[in-house]
């Protein structure tokens, strides 16, 4: 009994030492990006007793810690008072590292609410992000689209975002997107003393037709066989290797490939935009990426630049090309290690990056278009001064497993004089795109029960067996080609996939000998024409 009484007296004495008012607490809803998805972050601000100081906890990085100075100056320049005493800011959940300056605005609003300089009951209804300038202006931040999608999933009324990010957030249906120019405007809106019209986007008008000055296949003189090969590639989603001397138009043709691909669907556009948003590639006022990306990294690109990485993993070029085209010019000049690590993304459509900070998976479903010279000095084999061994070593910089994932090997010959001077207009990209879309529609109907198979290039062994059947004469032709033309065994499935696409372009139900014959001609390296 005596021990119990002593414990009770000690507890009463300890409680009596605490001040009656330990400060005011405010909570602001925000969010942060992990990979290409966002997760909710609760910004807790407590204005308490003690010496005037600001402490930020919850695994903030350097940019978040620096927000103390930005916020304090922005508060003063907005006409507010900097809270006296100890201000503690917690970014929850505390076990996930927080990056970037996007917490400036919610921290500042939380400090105003905790110090009773504003009165509002709206902090729980909006997700708030934004970087503060020293003048108290609100600057744009990265990753607003995934943050808006998270706000929608959390059932929030809307988001308070920098005005330059408002269009990006407004593509999310059913969400009030409030654009703010400065801290005072945001505070007065939450108090209800200032009205701000939500930004709205008409998604039906976002997907504009291609502008008249867009790149077009009609601008390319000659190279009809290469245009045909790229049409087949676009129709089936096949990867392509263009082989030819300098000046034959390889880059010019590759840059025009996106103009014959089917338009992005809304889900594709949202996923593509999320990737570009978190990297900061969206232009001010841009809501969605509505055209298929075309990325062309230099051959000196690092592993992290091409595949993604850094200390805190971010998307690389292969993810920025998601749902679009990745063009690798001078393919043999890329580091072999970089090319080899591309094999998994080419096969699976995503890339997984492991770092000390965590493991991230980024989408990477793209069409690979690579280009290379036929020999080290760029000349055709019969004109080259390189020895057969030098040519062989040059070609062998591209490994067999990587070639396994490239369906079409296309020779790009020099353009003839009569083709350069031909005044007749070439076929427009729009006409070619119509045929490509018709072939894609046939594939969508064929694979409607297999959502992971989006086009012929994505077929596995089961799909090839089911939809690439050959009659006896056609099988004999393929057998002859494999033997007589010295085709490698790895070419077999690729030829069947390409032949299926050629049949789809022709509107044919079955693969014929003509379709197989054309597919065989598109396997130059397997025919080993350079020894």
Language-model-derived ranges and their functions:
Residues 129, 328-331:
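Hydrophobic residues in beta-strands of the RecA-like P-loop NTPase core, especially within AAA+ ATPase
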Residues 287-305:
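Inter-Walker segment of RecA-like/P-loop motor cores
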Residues 231, 293, 304-325:
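Conserved alpha-helical scaffold flanking the Walker A/P-loop in AAA+ ATPase domains
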Residues 244, 308, 330:
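The Walker A (P-loop) glycine that initiates the GxxxxGKT/S ATP-binding motif of P-loop NTPases
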Residues 2-241, 245-251, 354, 491-492, ...:
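Peripheral, non-AAA+ core regions of ATP-driven protein-machinery
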Residues 57-68, 83, 90-100, 312-313, ...:
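Basic, amphipathic alpha-helical bundle interface domains used for macromolecular binding and assembly
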Residues 242-281:
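Walker A/P-loop
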């Amino acid at each position: 009994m005596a021990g119990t009484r002593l414990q009770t007296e000690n507890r009463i004495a300890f409680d009596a030492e605490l001040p009656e008012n330990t400060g005011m607490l405010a909570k602001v809803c925000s969010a942060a990006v992990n990979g290409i998805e966002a997760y909710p972050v609760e910004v807790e601000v407590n204005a308490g007793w003690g010496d005037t100081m600001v402490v930020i906890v919850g695994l903030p990085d350097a940019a978040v810690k620096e927000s103390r100075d930005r916020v304090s100056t922005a508060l003063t320049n907005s006409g507010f008072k900097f809270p006296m005493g100890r201000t503690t800011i917690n970014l929850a959940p505390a076990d996930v590292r927080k990056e970037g300056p996007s917490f400036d605005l919610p921290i500042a609003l939380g400090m105003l609410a905790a110090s009773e300089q504003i009165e509002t009951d709206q902090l729980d209804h909006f997700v708030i992000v934004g970087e503060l300038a020293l003048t108290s202006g609100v600057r744009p931040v990265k990753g607003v689209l995934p943050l808006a999608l998270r706000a929608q999933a959390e059932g929030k009324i809307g988001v308070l975002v920098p005005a330059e990010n408002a269009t990006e957030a407004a593509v999310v249906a059913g969400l009030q997107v409030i654009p703010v120019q400065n801290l005072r405007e945001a505070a007065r809106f939450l108090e209800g003393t200032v009205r701000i019209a939500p930004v709205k986007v008409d998604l039906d008008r976002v997907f504009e037709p291609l502008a008249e000055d867009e790149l077009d296949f009609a601008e390319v003189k000659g190279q009809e066989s290469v245009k045909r090969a790229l049409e087949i590639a676009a129709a089936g989603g096949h990867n392509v290797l263009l082989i030819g001397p300098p000046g034959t138009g390889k880059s010019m043709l590759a840059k025009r490939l996106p103009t014959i691909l089917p338009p992005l669907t809304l889900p594709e556009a949202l996923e593509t935009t999320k990737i570009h948003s978190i990297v900061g590639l969206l232009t001010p006022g841009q809501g969605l990426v509505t055209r298929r990306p075309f990325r062309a990294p230099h051959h000196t690109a690092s592993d992290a630049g091409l595949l993604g990485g850094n200390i805190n993993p971010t998307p690389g070029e292969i993810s920025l090309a998601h749902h679009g085209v990745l063009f690798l010019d001078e393919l043999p000049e890329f580091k072999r290690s970089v090319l080899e690590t591309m094999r998994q993304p080419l096969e699976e459509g995503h890339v997984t990056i492991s770092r000390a900070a965590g493991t991230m998976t980024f989408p990477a479903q793209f069409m690979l278009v690579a280009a290379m010279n036929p020999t080290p000095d760029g000349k055709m084999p019969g004109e080259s001064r390189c020895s057969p061994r030098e040519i062989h070593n040059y070609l062998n910089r591209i490994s067999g497993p990587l070639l396994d994932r490239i369906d079409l090997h296309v020779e790009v010959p020099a353009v003839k004089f009569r083709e350069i001077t031909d005044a007749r207009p070439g076929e427009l990209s729009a006409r070619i795109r119509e045929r490509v879309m018709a072939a894609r529609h046939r594939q969508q109907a064929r694979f409607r029960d297999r959502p992971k198979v989006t086009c012929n290039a994505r077929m596995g062994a089961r799909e090839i067996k089911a939809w690439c059947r050959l009659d006896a004469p056609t099988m004999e032709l393929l057998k002859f080609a494999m033997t007589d033309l010295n085709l490698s065994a790895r070419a077999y499935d690729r030829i069947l996939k390409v032949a299926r696409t050629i049949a789809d372009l022709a509107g044919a139900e079955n693969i014929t000998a003509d379709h197989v014959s054309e597919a065989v001609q598109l396997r130059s390296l397997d025919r080993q024409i350079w020894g």
